[in-house]
Swiss-Prot record:
NCBIfam families recorded: miaA
Record-given protein name: tRNA dimethylallyltransferase
Necessary cofactors: Mg(2+)
Main enzyme class: transferase
Length: 308
């Protein structure tokens, strides 16, 4: 373990549409590193356009680990990511290269670097039962249940946040212990030295414009057709984490007739901007970050200087 701590990994975090992938590819060209994706949308197969997955030309230059690894109908947790990422890091280091972790899923970064509590895995039967209860009695009734067994979590989780509410109840029903109690115990610390960068524009308007431009480009690349194909499957629905990804949810609802095309475009752009705002909030509270300005000419030199 002491020897492992000498090894460095580079992390490149940032909000959506901030230029992470472009900078990461330049790093691969100029530094002996391999990219590990830290993105909860890129893990899914058949979700290429709307997730801004690197294209074939980009992947030929800079292959990405941990993209296209699961079906959209399957579940994948932060604990799954931590396990998979640690294995990839070990493999890359064993081949004499530097791992470069790139993405905007801050929950994954937090799980990897700070460790995770030993929570039980998903239980399909219990999840189904919770869904039945929610359908019959409403999420407020389930929130009242959570107040009884885990008042601390109930105070933190809103009744209109079904994913987190269901998970807190699921943990209690599986383990007999509250989420609050279990999260006091952390898994083993991150065994590497992390050199951590964050990239974002200084002007929020620049990021907002980049988000709008990128989403409209996705529409030109066939995003609606991609969602139509996913929607034609009988095992996908809006309650799945994959279909709750920003853009996919709004497009699905448009195809369901909930609103017209123009409204879908507007809602998807607004939702993406809200995601970027949450990502930036996380990053501002993240320690030991070296900040980079999106599009700055010296970004590559800065990363190389700190990483060597």
């Amino acid at each position: 373990m002491t020897e492992q701590r000498k090894h460095k990994v580079i992390t490149l975090m940032g909000p959506t549409a901030s230029g992470k992938t472009a900078l990461a590819i330049e790093l691969v060209k100029n530094y002996d590193c391999e990219i590990i994706s830290v993105d909860s949308a890129l893990i899914y197969q058949q979700m290429d356009v709307g997730s801004a997955k690197p294209d074939a030309a980009e992947l030929a230059v800079a292959p990405h680990h941990l993209i296209d690894i699961i079906d959209p109908a399957d579940s994948y947790s932060a604990a799954d990511f931590r396990k998979d990422a640690l294995l990839k890091i070990e493999d890359i280091i064993s081949r004499g290269k530097t791992p470069l972790l790139v993405g905007g899923t801050m929950m994954y970064f937090k799980a990897l670097i700070e460790g995770l509590s030993p929570l039980p895995g998903a239980n399909d039967e219990i999840r189904a039962q919770i869904a039945v209860e929610a359908q019959a009695n409403g999420w407020q009734a389930l929130h009242d249940q959570l107040k009884e067994v885990d008042p601390v979590a109930a105070a933190r989780i809103h009744p209109n946040d079904p994913q987190r509410l269901a998970r807190a109840l699921e943990v209690f029903r599986i383990s007999g212990k509250s989420l609050t109690e279990l999260t006091k115990v952390k898994s083993e610390a991150f065994p590497y030295e992390a050199i951590q960068f964050a990239i974002a524009p200084n002007d929020r308007k620049v990021l907002h414009k980049a988000i709008e431009t990128r989403f409209k480009a996705m529409l030109g690349l066939g995003f609606v057709e991609e969602v139509k194909k996913l929607k034609s499957r009988d095992d996908l629905h809006l309650e799945l984490p994959s279909m709750r990804c920003v853009g996919y949810r709004q497009c699905w609802q448009h195809l369901d007739g909930e609103y017209d095309y123009e409204t879908m475009v507007e809602k998807a752009i607004v939702a993406t901007r809200q995601l970027a705002k949450r990502q930036l909030t996380w990053l501002r509270g993240w320690p030991d970050l070296i900040w980079l300005e999106s599009g700055a000419e010296n970004n590559l030199d800065t990363v190389l200087r700190y990483s060597r």
